[in-house]
């Protein structure tokens, strides 16, 4: 399955609780909670580029499945992680006590991030 495309956020659950759990300042949480960000994914074999635009903030991360890479987290912090593919439609990684699962189903992408007992879920649709 090729994951390339542009996707816009439709819904999110537990945004504020998750952002607090990962140390995001309250003023940034308030600014970001209603933004319907756009993610552009470019896949070339096992190599991926994610460009995430939320308001004026743009985060660009590149990785190759199964290889350690450095990525920018939503807090602006640089992290090291290894992204794996599970089955035909899931990208999974764990970093700093956070498990991230991105699942592709047709024109819908569901991203779930879990830290402790706080689960943040974001659903995006292809545009």
UniProtKB/Swiss-Prot annotation:
Pfam families attached to this UniProt entry: Lipocalin_7
PTM info: Deamidation and transpeptidation at the beta carboxyl of Asn-105 forms an isoaspartyl residue and Edman degradation appears as though blocked. This rearrangement gives rise to an extra negative charge carried by the acid form.
Family: Belongs to the calycin superfamily. Fatty-acid binding protein (FABP) family.
Coiled-coil features, chain-numbered ranges: none
Organism encoding this protein: Bos taurus
Residue(s) carrying Phosphoserine: 39, 56, 100
Subunit structure: Monomer.
Record remark on domains: Forms a beta-barrel structure that accommodates hydrophobic ligands in its interior.
N-acetylmethionine, modified sites: 1
N6-succinyllysine: modified positions: 31, 36, 46, 57, 78, 90, 121
GO cellular component annotations of the record: cytosol; nucleoplasm; nucleus
Isoaspartyl glycine isopeptide (Asn-Gly), cross-linked positions: 105-106
Database matches in PROSITE patterns: FABP (PS00214)
Gene Ontology molecular functions: antioxidant activity; chromatin binding; fatty acid binding
Job description of the protein: Plays a role in lipoprotein-mediated cholesterol uptake in hepatocytes. Binds cholesterol. Binds free fatty acids and their coenzyme A derivatives, bilirubin, and some other small molecules in the cytoplasm. May be involved in intracellular lipid transport.
Protein name, per record: Fatty acid-binding protein, liver
Gene Ontology biological process terms in this record: cellular response to hydrogen peroxide; cellular response to hypoxia; fatty acid transport
């Amino acid at each position: 399955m090729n994951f390339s495309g542009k996707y816009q956020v439709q819904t999110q659950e537990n945004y504020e609780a998750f952002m607090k759990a990962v140390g995001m300042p309250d003023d940034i949480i308030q600014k970001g909670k209603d933004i319907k960000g756009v993610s552009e994914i470019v896949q070339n074999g096992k190599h991926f580029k994610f460009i995430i635009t939320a308001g004026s903030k743009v985060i660009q991360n590149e990785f190759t499945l199964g290889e350690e890479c450095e990525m920018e987290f939503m807090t602006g912090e640089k992290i090291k992680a290894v992204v794996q593919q599970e089955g035909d439609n899931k990208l999974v990684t764990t970093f700093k006590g956070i498990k991230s699962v991105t699942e592709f189903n047709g024109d819908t992408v569901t991203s779930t991030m879990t830290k402790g007992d706080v689960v943040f879920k974001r659903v995006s649709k292809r545009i």
